[in-house]
Amino acid sequence: KEGYIVNYHDGCKYECYKLGDNDYCLRECKARYGKGAGGYCYAFGCWCTHLYEQAVVWPLPKKTCN
């Protein structure tokens, strides 16, 4: 599974500005989803890879980013 890491409180994606390989995104993806996860910056959001199937990613149901 893959997807954007999401803030549970406001429903927003984790933003990033350095596209491609990104230490911040990699660190956040691993912290949330475990050391097997990967991450990089895609379309100014942190995109996480190698997630377990039940991982919660953006968008959150009934929670829009505002």
From Swiss-Prot:
Q: Which GO terms describe its molecular function?
A: sodium channel inhibitor activity; toxin activity
Q: Which domain of life is it from?
A: Eukaryota
What this protein is reported to do is described as: Beta toxins bind voltage-independently at site-4 of sodium channels and shift the voltage of activation toward more negative potentials thereby affecting sodium channel activation and promoting spontaneous and repetitive firing. A mixture of Cbo2 and Cbo3 is weakly active on the human voltage-gated sodium channels Nav1.4/SCN4A and Nav1.6/SCN8A when tested at 200 nM. In vivo, is toxic to mice when intraperitoneally injected.
Q: Which SUPFAM superfamilies match?
A: Scorpion toxin-like (SSF57095)
Q: In which tissues is it expressed?
A: Expressed by the venom gland.
Give the UniProt subcellular location, in the record's own words: Secreted
| UniProt-recorded name of the protein | Beta-toxin Cbo3
GO biological process, alphabetically ordered = defense response
Question: Can you list the disulfide-bonded cysteine pairs?
Answer: 12-65, 16-41, 25-46, 29-48
Keywords attached to this Swiss-Prot or TrEMBL record, sorted alphabetically, are: Amidation, Disulfide bond, Ion channel impairing toxin, Neurotoxin, Secreted, Toxin, Voltage-gated sodium channel impairing toxin
What GO terms fall under cellular component here? extracellular region
What further note is attached to this protein's record? Negative results: a mixture of Cbo2 and Cbo3 does not modify the currents of the human voltage-gated sodium channels Nav1.1/SCN1A, Nav1.2/SCN2A, Nav1.3/SCN3A, Nav1.5/SCN5A and Nav1.7/SCN9A.
Positions modified as Asparagine amide? 66
Species of origin reads Centruroides bonito (Scorpion)
* Similarity annotation: Belongs to the long (4 C-C) scorpion toxin superfamily. Sodium channel inhibitor family. Beta subfamily.
Its domain comment says:
Has the structural arrangement of an alpha-helix connected to antiparallel beta-sheets by disulfide bonds (CS-alpha/beta).
Q: Where is the LCN-type CS-alpha/beta domain?
A: 1-66
